[in-house]
Each structure stands twice: as structure tokens, then as C-alpha cells.
Design a protein with these regions (language model features):
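An acidic, charge-biased composition feature
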Residues: 1-212
Length: 212
């Protein structure tokens, strides 16, 4: 997960089995290599506290599995970046985000709150380009290159069936963490929330944009 607060950093969740000795040795070996290559200049190891109040307690194993699979999905998206134009990359991210959240959409009353939360920054011309791109090109086939996309969607269906917190809260938290993995930039996240809402409103108003 990428963050900018304090200073730019990456947070890695590490799961240890048994006494975890071998796994810890691998972690420290990785850290030493990263320090030597100057990929990082510092590190800290902290206890991981599950956020039950945010995601609910009953399905947390599924939530953590989603974290792992969504991380793979974000890496796959970022690998495609160099072969896409800016509009194609933004359109792909909007398509994937809506696809992931489809199971929630019929259950959330206030979509405007979820997707336009805390932001008034909408570039209408960019939003129109994204809508046109999604309407005229087959992003379903492009998403077949993203091996973790379907697995994420299937996991979300199970998570929803076992949820213990409101739909809006769960959708908002999962969307936020998805964009943290992609960008780690709140301003950029809020711009994407606007794009998502623009596409959803367009489909409500009869513009055909297929999201699968």
C-alpha cells in the first residue's frame, strides 16, 4: 500500500506461520537488499492491527484475501501503463473500479457520497473523454489480461454476503484502499471518484457503457 503522509512510503503486510523464524529471515534479507540498492533509505516493523470497525469482524479472512488479490490486480494494471495512453489508462482504472464495485451498486442509496466524496475537482472534458473511450472500446477483453480481476470480483460477492457493516462503509473503504495501492494520492483518488460517478450517471441516462 502506497502512502504519502509523513513522507512517501510503502506498507507491506507480512503474515507469519508457526514461529515465523524463516519468514522473518527472508524479510530482513529483502530489506537489506533494498537498502543496499538504495530503493529504500529506512524501514520500521510494526504490529498489524485488524480494522474490524472498518470492515467488520465476521468476514475478515475474506477481506485480507481481497487485500492480497487486489494488490496483484493493481500490479497488473501498473504493468500495462507503459502501453496505454493517458485516457486509456484512466478509462481502464474507472472500468476496473466500477466492475469491482458492481455488487454494491444496487444496494447503495447515496452513490454521490461514495464516489464524489470530499472532492469538487471534476475535469468535464477529461470525464467526457473517458466516457467516450469506454463506450467505443472493448475494455472487457482488455480486462481479461488482468488475471486477478475476476478473482477480486468473486471475492467481493462473498464479502458482501457475509458483511457486518453498512454497504456504503464497506464500498468506500475498499475503493479507498484499491486506489491507495494504485496511487497513494488522495487528490488523484478523488478525481477518479468523480470520473466513476460521471460514468455511472451516464449509464443511468441511457448511454450504453458495458461494465462486466
Amino acid at each position: 500500500i502506497r502512502y504519502q503522509d509523513d513522507r512517501p512510503h510503502i506498507r507491506l503486510r507480512i503474515y507469519l506461520h508457526g514461529n515465523g523464524t524463516n519468514s522473518l529471515q527472508e524479510v530482513f534479507s529483502f530489506i537489506n537488499i533494498a537498502l543496499t540498492l538504495e530503493y529504500i533509505d529506512d524501514y520500521s516493523i510494526c504490529p498489524y492491527e485488524r480494522e474490524y470497525e472498518r470492515y467488520g469482524a465476521g468476514n475478515y479472512n475474506l477481506i485480507e484475501k481481497f487485500f492480497m488479490v487486489d494488490s496483484k490486480l493493481c500490479l497488473d494494471i501498473l504493468k500495462l501503463r507503459r502501453n496505454l495512453s493517458n485516457t486509456e489508462f484512466k478509462s481502464l482504472n474507472v472500468y476496473v473500479a466500477i466492475g469491482l464495485l458492481q455488487p454494491f451498486l444496487g444496494k447503495i442509496e447515496n452513490q454521490e457520497f461514495i464516489f464524489r466524496q470530499k472532492s469538487n475537482k471534476l475535469d468535464k472534458s477529461e470525464a467526457n473523454l473517458i466516457k467516450s473511450e469506454l463506450r467505443n472500446n472493448n475494455y472487457f477483453s482488455r480486462c481479461q489480461e488482468l488475471k486477478s480481476y475476476k478473482e477480486c470480483k468473486d471475492l467481493l460477492k462473498s464479502i458482501i454476503n457475509q458483511r457486518t457493516v453498512p454497504y456504503e462503509q464497506l464500498a468506500d473503504s475498499l475503493l479507498h484502499m484499491h486506489f491507495n495501492r494504485l496511487f497513494g494520492d488522495l487528490d488523484l483518488e478523488f478525481r477518479y471518484r468523480n470520473y466513476i460517478l460521471e460514468v455511472l450517471n451516464a449509464t443511468k441516462n441511457g448511454i450504453r457503457i458495458d461494465i462486466n
